[in-house]
Amino acid sequence: VVIFLGTVAHKTSPQRPDRLLIRLRHLVDNVEQLKIYVNDLDPELLPAPQDVKEHCAHSAFACFQKAKLKPANTGSNKTIISDLVTQLRRRLPATKAEKKQQSLVKCPSCDSYEKKTPKEFLE
C-alpha cells in the first residue's frame, strides 16, 4: 500500500482487461472463422436471437451457444468446425450485475426465437 498526499492507493497490477470483454472478442473471432465454413455446416434451422434487450443478453447468448451447429460430412474441415464450435460453447465469465438480474428478469426461451439457416444464424 502506498500513501500519496493523504490518499491510500493499493499497489495492484495495472487495470487488467475485463475478462468478459476479452472472451466476447474471442467469440466474435470464432464466429467470423465459422462464417468461412458456413457451407460445410449441417443445414438444420437454428434459433437466432435478434433485437435482444440488454438485460436478456446473457440468456440470448446462452441460446446461441446451445444451438446445434454441426459440421456436415466434409472431411478435413469437420475437425476445424468442431473445434470452433467447442470454443463457442465455453461459458462466459459472470458479472455481478448479471448475477443480481438473473433472479429478477424473465427472458424469452430459446424456442421462442425465429429459426434461421446457419448462414443467417452466424450473421
UniProtKB/Swiss-Prot annotation:
InterPro entries: 4_helix_cytokine-like_core (IPR009079), IL-15/IL-21_fam (IPR003443)
Carbohydrate attachment residues: 77
Key words, A-Z: Cytokine, Disulfide bond, Glycoprotein, Secreted, Signal
Disulfide bonds: 56-107, 63-110
Signal sequence bounds: 1-10
ATP-binding found in the keyword field: no
A GO MF term: cytokine activity
GO terms under biological process: cellular response to virus; germinal center B cell differentiation; positive regulation of immunoglobulin production; positive regulation of natural killer cell mediated cytotoxicity; T follicular helper cell differentiation
GO cellular component assignments: extracellular space
Main location: secreted
Protein's cellular compartments: Secreted
Family designation: Belongs to the IL-15/IL-21 family.
Reported function: Cytokine with immunoregulatory activity. May promote the transition between innate and adaptive immunity. Induces the production of IgG(1) and IgG(3) in B-cells. Implicated in the generation and maintenance of T follicular helper (Tfh) cells and the formation of germinal-centers. Together with IL6, control the early generation of Tfh cells and are critical for an effective antibody response to acute viral infection. May play a role in proliferation and maturation of natural killer (NK) cells in synergy with IL15.
Protein's name in the database: Interleukin-21
Gene from which this protein is expressed: Il21
